[in-house]
Amino acid sequence: MIIIPAIDLKNGCCVRLEQGLMEKDTVFNDDPGAQAAEWQRQGGEILHIVDLDGAFAGEPKNRSAIEAIVKSVTIPTQLGGGIRDIATIEAYLSLGIGRVIIGTAAQRNPAFVKEACAKFAGKIVVGIDAKNGMVAVQGWAEVTGITATELARQFEGDGVSAIIYTDISRDGMMQGPNIQATKALAEAINIPVIASGGLSSLQDIENLIAIESSGVTGVITGKAIYSGAINLAEAIALTKKQR
């Protein structure tokens, strides 16, 4: 189990949203590069970056902040938000991003995921965000009629490196991740699952470690480490004990 610290970018700053609502944002740091370096210093092994403005606009919006992050760390990075075409993927990989996350475009155009995996082997992750089990897209503003499991199954065999599963109702709410839904998704597919949304305590991490054998390989944390509810170094130490 790998603990993955998150940096969510809005207007060039590190923010956290509640349940994906852009108007419910809290700025934690106006220097994303410094924040990235701090998470690496505390032992972060991978950094998760989201271009929130990009997710809503459908195109990259925080390029200078993303460049600053990449220059500030030596650990691998993964980035999502507004990635809708091959040219954007190429641009981010050239910048030094390790893996890109396809979200809305994966639901709207599954063939794009297949094409991206063929062109950039090992570099593509699919982000599936769900509300009450149903996939939500366009920065979570639109809930579709397809379940998370149905969508994830479409990518089996494409070469997707991982599925990041976010339960929107838990995100930023500090109520614990949806263990049951995360486990069910991981058991239903043959792609590794990274949990996201709601992590609030070391007990939550223990609960995720307990379902690791189902195919849950990591967890993304944002608000919990920014607010101090979880100490990142302690959380990483806990997972390393289990390895």
From Swiss-Prot:
Pathway: Amino-acid biosynthesis; L-histidine biosynthesis; L-histidine from 5-phospho-alpha-D-ribose 1-diphosphate: step 4/9. Gene3D superfamilies: Aldolase class I (3.20.20.70). One of its GO terms (biological process) is L-histidine biosynthetic process. Keywords: Amino-acid biosynthesis, Cytoplasm, Histidine biosynthesis, Isomerase. The active site is at D8 (proton acceptor), D129 (proton donor). CDD domains: HisA (cd04732). InterPro entries: Aldolase_TIM, His_biosynth, HisA_bact_arch, Isoase_HisA-like, Isoase_HisA-like_bact, RibuloseP-bd_barrel. It is found in: Cytoplasm. It catalyses: 1-(5-phospho-beta-D-ribosyl)-5-[(5-phospho-beta-D-ribosylamino)methylideneamino]imidazole-4-carboxamide = 5-[(5-phospho-1-deoxy-D-ribulos-1-ylimino)methylamino]-1-(5-phospho-beta-D-ribosyl)imidazole-4-carboxamide. One of its GO terms (cellular component) is cytoplasm. Its EC number is 5.3.1.16. Belongs to the HisA/HisF family. This is 1-(5-phosphoribosyl)-5-[(5-phosphoribosylamino)methylideneamino] imidazole-4-carboxamide isomerase.
